[in-house]
From Swiss-Prot:
UniProt name for this protein: Putative uncharacterized protein YLR444C
Taxonomy, superkingdom: Eukaryota
Record membrane topology: Multi-pass membrane protein
Predominant place of localization: membrane
Organism of derivation: Saccharomyces cerevisiae (strain ATCC 204508 / S288c) (Baker's yeast)
Record-annotated membrane-spanning stretches: 50-70, 75-95
Length: 100
């Protein structure tokens, strides 16, 4: 499920990280049945995709730098995924989310 979401991403600046962050966020919230067009709903209020992009954009520079440092894209995805998962798990509040 997460692999499909990452494979559908373009290689444009910010989109790879945005896709990884949103995939990890959906995975972390047990929202495997959500499609890519769904909004996250936390306590009845929708989180717009712009909020997810605002979180993902600073990491786009890390992704672009990683592409020049590492030859394998799997290394890049692994490093960004681990860092992103750590940040999401430590920074996001514990709320019940569902697809909306």
């Amino acid at each position: 499920m997460m692999g499909e979401r990452i494979q559908n991403c373009n290689a444009d600046e910010g989109l790879i990280t945005l896709c990884i962050l949103s995939s990890l966020s959906l995975l972390d919230r047990n929202l495997m049945s959500c499609n890519s067009n769904s909004s996250l709903v936390a306590n009845g209020s929708c989180l717009p995709p712009l909020l997810i992009f605002a979180v993902g954009f600073p990491w786009s520079k890390l992704v672009l730098a990683s592409f020049s440092l590492f030859k394998s894209t799997s290394d890049v995805f692994l490093i960004v995924a681990i860092v992103s998962l750590f940040l999401i798990s430590s920074a996001s509040p514990e709320v019940d989310c569902r697809c909306g």
